[in-house]
Structure formats: structure tokens, C-alpha cells
Amino acid sequence: MTKKTQVGLIFGGNSSEYEVSIVSCRNIYKAIDKEKFDVHPIWITNEGYFANEEESFKVLEDPSYQVKNPHKVHNISNLIELENLPEIDVFFPIVHGNLGEDGVLQGLFRLMNKPFVGDDVLAAAVTMDKEFTKILAQRVGVPVADWITIKRFEYDDKNNDKLDYEKVAEKLGRDMFVKPSNQGSSVGVSHVTNADEYAAALKEAFKYDDKVLVEETVPGTEVETAVLGNDKPIVAGVGQITNAKGSFYSYKNKYDDNSTSKLQIPADLPQEIIDTVRRNARKVYEVTECSGMARIDSMLTPGGKVVLTEVNALPGFTNISMYPKLFEEAGVPYTELITRLIEVGMERFDHKKTLLHKHD
């Protein structure tokens, strides 16, 4: 009998996307091939405590469950020696947002010398930062929305011109989006059209980050595609998101079962547009050095221009998430998708073991 691969499914975390992580983890646990994998859920509470496996299963059944015997991690050895933690063959992190998809957790796996699913340290960190993603996308000719960046010290200087809506509007137009540079799932994002909304949006965004992006609004339809793999990635088809008039693809619309946003897979678009979305996705995936997986989001303008909005290195796996739905449409069902994600993570690890880390 073939020995099953032991998978450590890490979820939760001290993140604004804590609840999304639990839903994604539950779906992955239900869908994973139990004949190939033994799954060990590892719950990180919102306070940053590690729970044992028994309690981790309980919170998957009831997200409101509170940990009874938390194990506070003070250093790496604490994590490695977590009580009742089996010998894990590969980690599958599904911790969304800060500390989960920004390279921090990935760096920990590297220190532990363990394979893991999803992007490596550099790609996770770069794609979490919306400004760096834009800069790299421009390098390979992928259009992005015009923007300015406001740092915390600039926000604290109340005389800074970047806080003046009218002056910013001269560059970006009066219709803008304000968003934390290092957040996902549209957390802290606001749509503004006047000075009062702009001031309130900056205040909200700086609750989540020390760097905030102010972008011109790109009119049109939101389109997304999904990418899987390492050196020779597979780009799925394209999905289209239709939002209710006057709304955008907000946190609520992304994860609420009563969302007013409608997902259309495959997108009903000309083949030329489909090809551009997929081609741009591959360029951005490669220039940001992604591996494993990513969801690439863009806006399609009425004039047919495809403008990159975001690279999500750890896309959602909820019931309404675009990433698994796009691959299902491409002929890769949920269970097979999870298997392939684990396989490409282990392949990357095996390759890195062949590299020299010291000079003889």
C-alpha cells in the first residue's frame, strides 16, 4: 500500500481575511483526495495562537469556536515542536492577507526546509504589494491604472498635497479608488468622487496599512483568469464579473452568498479580448516570479483595453471563488486541482534541493 502524503493545512491567522480563510480551508478539506493525502488542519487563531488538531477540526465545523488550549508561538522551534503535530510532508497554507500570503509564512516553511503549496517568498511579498505589482507589470508592457502612493509619514503631514482631493484629481480624475497597498479581498477599499469621501477613504485605508494607493477609476467590466504551475504554467480561461450599478467587487460582494455581483464563466467576450487577458496574465505571472498558483484580475474598458488591477497569489477557495471555478471550466475539477497544486509545490521544493547553497 502506497504511503499517503501528510498535508498540513494551515488556516485562520491574525488577518482581516480570517473568516474567508476558514471557509476556504473547509472546502479544501472536503475536496482533497483522501486516498492520496492525510490532512492535518492547523488553525491559527485571530490572536496568533496555534491550536491542536482536535480544536482545528472543531473550528472548521463551527467558525465561532474559541480555542481552549492555545499554543503561543514565540519562535520557530515552538512551531516545529507543536504538540501532536505529525511529520508533515507538505504544507498547504490557506491563510489569506497579512502574514499569510505576503511571504512571511512562506519564509517560515523555507526555514523549516519543507515544501509548500503556492508562491514562494519573493512572489508572495511582491504580489501582496499593489504598487510593486504595478511597477513590474509596466516593465513587461501590461497596462495598469494610473496612481499615486501615500506613505504614513505623508498622511501625518496634513499640508501634503497628496491629501488635497482637488490636486490629486488634477492627475487622476475626480473618480478614484483608495486602497491599502498590502491587503486583499478589497479590504479597506473605497470608491470616492468628492473631497469628503476622499478624506474618509484615506482614514479607512490607513487603518490597514502604512502605504495607501490612490488610483484613477478604470470604467468597464472586471475580468479574471487563473494560473497554475511553475516554469510552464497553465493559464485557464477567463471569467467576467458583473456588478450592480454603482457598486464594485467589494469584500461583501466577493464572499456574501447574497452578493449583487454575478460571475460569468466562461466570459462572453471576443476571442481577441480573451487572448489578451490570458497573455497579460502569463506575462505578469512570470515577471513577478509566481509559482504554484495565482489569480490575475483586470478591468476591461468599453474601448477594449485590458488594465491589470491585482495579482492574488493566494486566491479564495470558497463556494463562489473564481479560481477553482475557472479551472473546473477548463476541465480540472476541484479535487484534481488541489492534487496538482500540492504536486507543483513539491516539484519546486525538489528542484531547490538540487541548488548549491555554499561554495566548495
UniProtKB/Swiss-Prot annotation:
Reaction(s) catalysed by this chain's protein: 2 D-alanine + ATP = D-alanyl-D-alanine + ADP + phosphate + H(+)
Matches recorded under InterPro entries: ATP-grasp, ATP_grasp_subdomain_1, D-Ala_lig_Van_CS, D_ala_D_ala, Dala_Dala_lig_C, Dala_Dala_lig_N, PreATP-grasp_dom_sf
Limits of the ATP-grasp domain: 134-343
GO annotations of cellular component type: cytosol
Binding site for Mg(2+) 1: D297, E310
Broadest EC class assigned to this enzyme: ligase
Pathway listed: Cell wall biogenesis; peptidoglycan biosynthesis
Keywords: ATP-binding, Cell shape, Cell wall biogenesis/degradation, Cytoplasm, Ligase, Magnesium, Manganese, Metal-binding, Nucleotide-binding, Peptidoglycan synthesis
Family: Belongs to the D-alanine--D-alanine ligase family.
Name the record gives this protein: D-alanine--D-alanine ligase
Organism from which the protein derives: Lactobacillus helveticus (strain DPC 4571)
Gene name in the database record: ddl
